[in-house]
Amino acid sequence: SIVLFCLLCSCARIPAKLPEQTSNSTTETSAVYTPKPDEIRAVWISCYELPDAAQGEEKFRERAEEMFNNVADMKLNTVFVHVRAFADAVYPSKLFPWSKYSCKGSDPGFDPLKVMVECAHRAGLKIHAWINPFRVSSSDNIDSLPQGSPAKKLIGTDTVIQLKNGIYFDPASTDVHALIYDGVREILDGYEVDGIHIDDYFYPTRDESIDRAEYEAYVSGGGDKGLNEWRRDSVSAFAA
């Protein structure tokens, strides 16, 4: 995923002293940024930086408005808002449990994503729903997964990968792909977002054992690509 970062200089006042000038003489110049058509000037807002939905809709809305107005004041035009960091959601979902970050793992009594879409558009910004498709948890403890997590139902199958640094969905699994696509469709059908931003869609390890059964099935079916190329193709097939 690629984001264009732009250094914006708005009305920068630059004093310049020439040799023939006296110490009391200065020259001021002004650099004014002129936006280009269709240019994306974006900022990521991670799950750790979202307003606290547990404090209620009014305070959440106030904080969201403040954040997005600040973004607009910096001459940016797009926000990538983290709506799914760990197989969760910051909106009422039929597929994923409430996020433990902004939503503290339970229904806050309102729809945070709906509020953020409204606030972003009111500030003149485009808003993309940012998801991490394969991350399930930063902990390897299965018991730490919330009730309703789709990964919890799949533990022990080839669909979920459990490592020392966390739990992940198998990037090669077509069942995983279907789940992620359904999650994206849920967002597109329910919210007037301007895009979907997919980040961190890679294999969590080089360990050859995590998808051995799937790779062997591929080879048995006549596949002739090496493991690394097959894995790259699996991710490409997902993203396509």
Predicted segments with their positions:
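C-terminal motif of bacterial Sec signal peptides marking the signal peptidase cleavage site
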Residues: 7-10
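Bacterial lipoprotein signal-peptidase II cleavage site
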Residues: 12-19
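Active-site-adjacent "subsite" loops/lids of carbohydrate-active enzymes
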Residues: 34-61, 128-191
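Structural recognition of the beta-strand scaffold that forms the well-ordered cores
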Residues: 41-45, 77-82, 126-130, 195-199
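Catalytic domains of carbohydrate-active enzymes, especially glycoside hydrolases
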Residues: 62-89, 190-195
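Aromatic-lined substrate-binding rim segments of carbohydrate-active enzymes
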Residues: 67-68, 81, 85-132, 226-240
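Conserved, mostly hydrophobic/aromatic
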Residues: 71, 79, 120, 127, ...
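Polysaccharide-binding and catalytic clefts of secreted carbohydrate-active enzymes
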Residues: 114, 154-240
